[in-house]
Amino acid sequence: MYTILLIGIGGFIGAVLRYSLSGWVQNSFVNFPLGTLVVNIVGSFFLGLVMYLSEYQGLFSEETRILLTIGLLGAFTTLSTFSYESFRLLESSKLMQLTMNIVATVLFSIFAVYLGKISALNLAAYLRGIK
């Protein structure tokens, strides 16, 4: 039950953050789903960071990892919105924007996980140097 509560708390925070950031970014880009792209890239970066700090550096407890990854980042990122917005671009025959959205989301999100990993390794090395 405690784990479910952690996921729910993280999910609430992640959903509110996604709504806020995505809406703020999207206000300037009416014809391209940039808000969803940004939250997915940012979420991927933090997922890479948290997972590497948790799994390989032991900096987070299992409960904190669950709260952050499954709860907060699970609600912050959104495959369903990406899929819906991509389908809408397809329906509107905006094939160039559709291609850009799919390629940018996949490539930048994977690269963001990599940057999260590198950041985690650098942070862990820095923290070891302080001790």
UniProtKB/Swiss-Prot annotation:
One of its GO terms (cellular component) is plasma membrane. It holds the Pfam family CRCB. Na(+) binds at G74, T77. Keywords: Cell membrane, Ion channel, Ion transport, Membrane, Metal-binding, Sodium, Transmembrane, Transmembrane helix, Transport. GO terms for molecular function: fluoride channel activity; fluoride transmembrane transporter activity; metal ion binding. The keyword tRNA-binding does not apply. It is a multi-pass membrane protein. It is found in: Cell membrane. It comes from the Archaea. Its main location: membrane. The keyword Ion transport applies. The chain crosses the membrane at residues 4-24, 32-52, 66-86, 95-115. Na(+) is not transported, but it plays an essential structural role and its presence is essential for fluoride channel function. It catalyses: fluoride(in) = fluoride(out). GO terms for biological process: cellular detoxification of fluoride; fluoride transmembrane transport. Belongs to the fluoride channel Fluc/FEX (TC 1.A.43) family. Fluoride-specific ion channel. Important for reducing fluoride concentration in the cell, thus reducing its toxicity. This is Fluoride-specific ion channel FluC 1. It comes from Methanosarcina acetivorans (strain ATCC 35395 / DSM 2834 / JCM 12185 / C2A). The gene is fluC1.
